[in-house]
C-alpha cells in the first residue's frame, strides 16, 4: 500500500508543470539560445530548445 501511494505521488509530482509550458515560433539549436527569448517574452529565462523551437516555462 505504501509503495502504491509513493508511486502515485511521484507520478503527480513529475506531471506538474508540463501543461504550463509556452511554445514559441523561435527556432533554436541549443537551450542557451532560448534563455533571452523567454526572458523577453515572459520575464523569466526559464526555457529549453525542444524539436528545434524554444519552449518557455513561466
UniProtKB/Swiss-Prot annotation:
Note: Negative results: does not inhibit Kv1.4/KCNA4, Kv1.5/KCNA5, Kv2.1/KCNB1, Kv3.1/KCNC1, Kv4.2/KCND2, Kv11.1/KCNH2, Nav1.1/SCN1A, Nav1.2/SCN2A, Nav1.4/SCN4A, Nav1.5/SCN5A, B.germanica Nav1, and Cav3.3/CACNA1I (when 1 uM is tested).
Record comment regarding domains: Has the structural arrangement of an alpha-helix connected to antiparallel beta-sheets by disulfide bonds (CS-alpha/beta).
Tissue: Expressed by the venom gland.
Record-listed Pyrrolidone carboxylic acid modification sites: 22
Residues the UniProt record annotates as site (Aromatic residue of the functional dyad): 57
Primary site of residence: secreted
Designated name of the protein: Potassium channel toxin alpha-KTx 1.16
Organism whose genome encodes this protein: Mesobuthus eupeus
Superkingdom classification of source: Eukaryota
Amino acid at each position: 500500500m505504501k509503495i502504491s501511494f509513493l508511486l502515485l505521488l511521484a507520478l503527480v509530482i513529475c506531471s506538474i508543470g508540463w501543461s504550463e509550458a509556452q511554445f514559441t515560433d523561435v527556432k533554436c539549436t541549443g537551450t542557451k539560445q532560448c534563455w533571452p527569448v523567454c526572458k523577453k517574452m515572459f520575464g523569466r529565462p526559464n526555457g529549453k530548445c525542444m524539436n528545434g523551437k524554444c519552449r518557455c516555462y513561466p
